Amino acid sequence: MFAFFDEDLTVLDFSLFKNVVSIEIGDKSFTYVKTVCIAELPKLESVRIGFHSFFHADEYDGTQTADCHFYAYDCPELKELIIGSDSFVYYSRFVVKNLPSLEEIMIGDSVYCSQCFTYASLELKGEGMEHEVKNRLSKAENTQDWCGLFQEVRTSAD
């Protein structure tokens, strides 16, 4: 069963919900959304997205949906960003910026062959992000999983 299977809903912008503390999206949700924006939420602490969400109808025939983007930025209290397997498969951009409290990003499932953000570049922006990413990847048990996750990994302090 798909939730929010509405062709007219193409942008999901949470920035108006300034008092939200947690965002939880279930499995198989938001089929036609092409842009997800989680931005400027001063109280947000947790984002959890289920498996097979943001999976476009175009993807069923194996074609890439153009210009699909995920943004999470300027949420000073965000501690965790967890995305289930096979979500955002054909998204072309994944940007995480200025999340000073971020402790955990979990994308996909280590047991199941995940296909999250298969066609995206990973952009981590903000003070200290480059250092943190390099340190955490060097300590990862299986860096091969990370290497295949994104087409390109970029970090910067801007």
Across the structure, where does each feature detected by a protein language model lie?
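Right-handed parallel beta-helix
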Residues: 45-49, 77-83, 101-109
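Conserved hydrophobic position(s) of the canonical leucine-rich repeat
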Residues: 9, 20, 33, 44, ...
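Small-residue (G/S/T/A) turn/hinge positions that recur once per unit in extracellular repeat modules
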Residues: 1-5, 29, 53, 62-63, ...
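Leucine-rich solenoid repeat scaffolds
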Residues: 94-96, 102-158
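Inter-repeat linker/turn residues at the boundaries of leucine-rich repeats
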Residues: 7, 15-18, 28-31, 39-42, ...
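Acidic/polar low-complexity surface segments
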Residues: 49-69, 109-122
